[in-house]
Structure formats: structure tokens, C-alpha cells
């Protein structure tokens, strides 16, 4: 059992996903947390296909439901989400009971902060057949009990976990878990991979615009935004009178928007009043042709630009700095 699951550390979860064997994986991470003053423990589920979070449940949400976190999961109908929500709420209740049980096993008071975590899933090969299944529990961030690789026996981390091990052996829990991991887990992963494959055939073009951000000393930042595009591969460049400004451009990494699409921006610092000499160029496979954009000042700004330029020259330097901060 080489698992040290820390509360809601998604980066660690992704590291586990990327280093495990198998071309494709389905994993679920369940976490219940109690702390003083909390009426009921907070319960969170996140599900991953490979390195992509595709579902999430949070008991602290206004209307707790299993929700899609990947665009391709939006193809699932209301029946699927209702079924998954009911399963999540069932797991939530089981976790509350198990959290109290673990506190009793370790002779802990009810008033402290406690964490119970559960990770399970399956890996399939390129032929979509099972490579391995796994199921592990952690309590207070430390290993508690895990299903062994044979999917038939358990390893308990300490004496308290031995109590659980004996209970589960008598109840035949390993056989039930093995049936799920070898059956429904693999079938679900195959379905999700198919949904993702169908979505990969679609593209969403970026929605692009340029924003204007004043700086000190008579300069401004022009930032070119590309939002809501899919897939993630995109090119943003700035040009001055037709020449690329690669060296003078700040470019951020492409980031997920949280709805299955992506966003990115690129910026340059330019002299005040010279903004129209700069163009942003956006290239993405969802576009029929690359976009070329300039900053478009509001009508009121255009009419007053000469007055603003004169004012900037006349004001004292401390006032200019204050105007920039505001």
C-alpha cells in the first residue's frame, strides 16, 4: 500500500494517474471531513478518466448533485445524473457512519477534525480489457486498508484496520468489489472513452477580443484573449506593422475553463497612442480562417484621446502614478 492521499490535493491525484500502468484509467476519489462546529461532515467525490476530471459531487453545494466536469459528459441524460446523484448520497451516508466508527476504533473524541478517504478504479489496456483494479482507504491521511492485487484479499495498516478486515472477510466484501472492478468499472470506462472520442471530433472556435490596461510612464498593456475554444491547441501572436513580436510578448499557458473548453491570453506593452499599430493574430482549427484583432477603444475614449494625452503630459509624476493605481 503505497498510497498517501492528502485532502483534495488534485495534483497528487493526477500524478498517481499518470504513472500507473495502462493506457486508460477510471478513478474515483471520495473524501469526508469533519471539524469542530460542523453539523455533518463535508463529503466530496471527484472522478477521473485518465488525467481529466469528468464528474464531481460536493455535499456543501446549494443543491448537492453529481455534476459533469468534462464537456463530453454533457451527453449523458437526466436519468444518468439522477442515478449517480443517488449513489453519491448513499456513499455520503456510509462515509458519515464510517467516520464515526473510525473515531471509535482509535478512541478519538467527536470534537476534533477527522478525514476519511477512499480511492478505487480500474486500468484497461489498448484492447480495453482489464489490466488491474484497486481499492484503498485512508484515515487521517494515512493508509488504512487496501484490496490486494489479486482482488481477493486485504492488507490492513494497523490494529484498528484489522477490525475492518475481519468484518469484510466475513461479509465477502472483496468478492463484491472484485465483481465491480472486473465488470461495471471496465464497462463504464469503455463508455466514457467512447463519449470522449465522439467529442474529440468536434471543435469550438475561440471567442477573441483585446483589452486595454493603462500603465505608468505613458505606456499601456494590450491583452489579447481567446476564450471557450476546443481542442486546446491554439496560436496567439502580436504583430507591430506586420512584424511578429515574439520576444516582447507575454504568453500564458493554455488553461482549462472548467466547462471542457480552454482559454489563453497574450499581451504586449505599447506606447500610449500607438495602440492601433498593433494587431493580435489567433489561429485555431475551429476557425475557418485566422482572426486579426486590434484594440477597439470605446467611442467616448476616441473623442477624448487627445485631451487625455495632453493631461498626461501636464500632470505631475506623483499624480500620474496615483491615476495608474486607480
UniProtKB/Swiss-Prot annotation:
Residues 204-295 are annotated as: Alpha-3. It is found in: Membrane. SMART domains: IGc1. Its main location: membrane. Pfam families: C1-set (PF07654), MHC_I (PF00129). One of its GO terms (cellular component) is phagocytic vesicle membrane. One of its GO terms (biological process) is antigen processing and presentation of peptide antigen via MHC class I. It is a single-pass type I membrane protein. Residues 296-305 are annotated as: Connecting peptide. Disulfide bonds join 122-185, 224-280. Residues 22-111 are annotated as: Alpha-1. Glycans are attached at residues 107, 277. Residues 112-203 are annotated as: Alpha-2. Residues 206-294 form the Ig-like C1-type domain. Residues 22-305 are extracellular. Heterodimer of an alpha chain and a beta chain (beta-2-microglobulin). This is H-2 class I histocompatibility antigen, Q8 alpha chain.
Amino acid at each position: 500500500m503505497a498510497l498517501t492521499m492528502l485532502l483534495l490535493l488534485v495534483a497528487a491525484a493526477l500524478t498517481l494517474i499518470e504513472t500507473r500502468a495502462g493506457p486508460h484509467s477510471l478513478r474515483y476519489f471520495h473524501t469526508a471531513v469533519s471539524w469542530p462546529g460542523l453539523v455533518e461532515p463535508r463529503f466530496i467525490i471527484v472522478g477521473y478518466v485518465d488525467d481529466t476530471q469528468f464528474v464531481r459531487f460536493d455535499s456543501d453545494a446549494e443543491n448537492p448533485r453529481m455534476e459533469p466536469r468534462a464537456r463530453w459528459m454533457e451527453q449523458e441524460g437526466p436519468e444518468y445524473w439522477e442515478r449517480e446523484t443517488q449513489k453519491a448520497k448513499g456513499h455520503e451516508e456510509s462515509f458519515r457512519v464510517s467516520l464515526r466508527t473510525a473515531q471509535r476504533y482509535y478512541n478519538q473524541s467527536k470534537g476534533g477534525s477527522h478525514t476519511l478517504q477512499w480511492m478505487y478504479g480500474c486500468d484497461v489496456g489498448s484492447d480495453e480489457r482489464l489490466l488491474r483494479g484497486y481499492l484503498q482507504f485512508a484515515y487521517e491521511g494515512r493508509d488504512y486498508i487496501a484490496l490486494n492485487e489479486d482482488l481477493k484479499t486485504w492488507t490492513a495498516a494497523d490494529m484498528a484496520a484489522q477490525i475492518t478486515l475481519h468484518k469484510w472477510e466475513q461479509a465477502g466484501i472483496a468478492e463484491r468489489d472484485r465483481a465491480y472492478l472486473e465488470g461495471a468499472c471496465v464497462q463504464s470506462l469503455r463508455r466514457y472513452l467512447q463519449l470522449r472520442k465522439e467529442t474529440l471530433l468536434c471543435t469550438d472556435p475561440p471567442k477573441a477580443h483585446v483589452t486595454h490596461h493603462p500603465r505608468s510612464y505613458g505606456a499601456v498593456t494590450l491583452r489579447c484573449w481567446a476564450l471557450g475554444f476546443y481542442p486546446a491547441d491554439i496560436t496567439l501572436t502580436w504583430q507591430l506593422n506586420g512584424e511578429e513580436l515574439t520576444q516582447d510578448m507575454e504568453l500564458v499557458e493554455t488553461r482549462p475553463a472548467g466547462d471542457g473548453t480552454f482559454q489563453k491570453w497574450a499581451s504586449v506593452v505599447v506606447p500610449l497612442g500607438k495602440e492601433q499599430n498593433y494587431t493580435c493574430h489567433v489561429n485555431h482549427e475551429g476557425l475557418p480562417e485566422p482572426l486579426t484583432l486590434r484594440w477597439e477603444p470605446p467611442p467616448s475614449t476616441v473623442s477624448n484621446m487627445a485631451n487625455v494625452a495632453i493631461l498626461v503630459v501636464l500632470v505631475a509624476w506623483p499624480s500620474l502614478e496615483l491615476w495608474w493605481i486607480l
